[in-house]
């Protein structure tokens, strides 16, 4: 017991070496982009009218004055119709995550084994990320020749029909898939943040047991929801100025009667 007690005591004449000070780690720049200000638009209007709304908001945000401008979207034709009509000077970028979902399905169609399909998918995904989508399309054309063209009455689950649709998607968006150039220019390559905002809107308008028999009511809810998700305080400003607000100063009665 005495031995154990003396072992716990500091030894006389023995100096402990000072611990080496660790060099402070250099602060690395954040990899993910930081959101500065988000404004959200939502409407049941036709894409022609909605495109004009987007343009007005972009002008208000002074996006047209930016030295680098990008218009990111999925393969929906109406998105690129809006780009052509209102944002022609913006670099068109197909959302990379949408592109790879088509590549994944194409790899499943072109390979019989899961491991082989994954290997093909990884190679095509890498080539597309490097801006070499033309090579991927060439390989898919070769696979299409092997499978054959679909008949006119082909079912939706026919592999030949699915491959035809995938090739059409890639061909139509080939000019919006120069991801190597976009990365060098510092442009975004995905609309994931916008997809997240859409889900936040859907939580309010597409929830359980929600039915919109009145389109005007749905439009009003969409406007309020979009304003609530915006960072510029547009919803509090609207509520403070709306008719009937308790904080709003009412005009004199003689003016009300007039």
Positions of predicted regions on the chain:
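Catalytic center-proximal scaffold of phosphoryl-transfer enzymes
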Residues: 1-258
């Amino acid at each position: 017991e005495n031995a154990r007690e003396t072992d716990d005591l500091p030894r006389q004449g023995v100096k402990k070496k000072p611990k080496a000070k660790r060099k402070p780690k250099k602060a690395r720049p954040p990899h993910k982009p930081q959101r500065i200000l988000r404004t959200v638009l939502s409407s049941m209007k036709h894409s022609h009218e909605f495109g004009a709304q987007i343009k007005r908001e972009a002008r208000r945000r002074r996006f047209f004055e930016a030295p680098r401008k990008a218009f990111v979207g999925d393969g929906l034709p109406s998105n690129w119709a809006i780009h052509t009509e209102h944002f022609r000077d913006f670099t068109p970028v197909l959302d990379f995550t949408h592109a790879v979902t088509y590549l994944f399905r194409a790899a499943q169609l072109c390979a019989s084994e899961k491991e082989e399909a994954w290997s093909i998918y990884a190679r095509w995904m890498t080539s597309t990320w490097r801006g070499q989508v033309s090579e991927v399309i060439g390989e898919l054309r070769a696979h299409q020749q092997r499978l054959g063209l679909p008949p006119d009455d082909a079912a939706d689950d026919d592999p030949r029909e699915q491959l035809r649709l995938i090739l059409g998607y890639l061909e139509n968006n080939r000019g919006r898939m120069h991801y190597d150039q976009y990365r060098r220019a510092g442009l975004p390559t995905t609309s994931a943040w916008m997809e997240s905002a859409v889900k936040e809107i859907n939580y309010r308008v597409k929830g359980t047991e929600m039915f919109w028999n009145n389109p005007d009511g749905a439009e009003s809810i969409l406007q309020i929801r979009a304003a609530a998700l915006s960072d510029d305080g547009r919803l509090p400003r609207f509520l403070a100025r709306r008719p009937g607000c308790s904080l709003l100063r009412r005009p004199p009665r003689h003016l009300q009667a007039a």
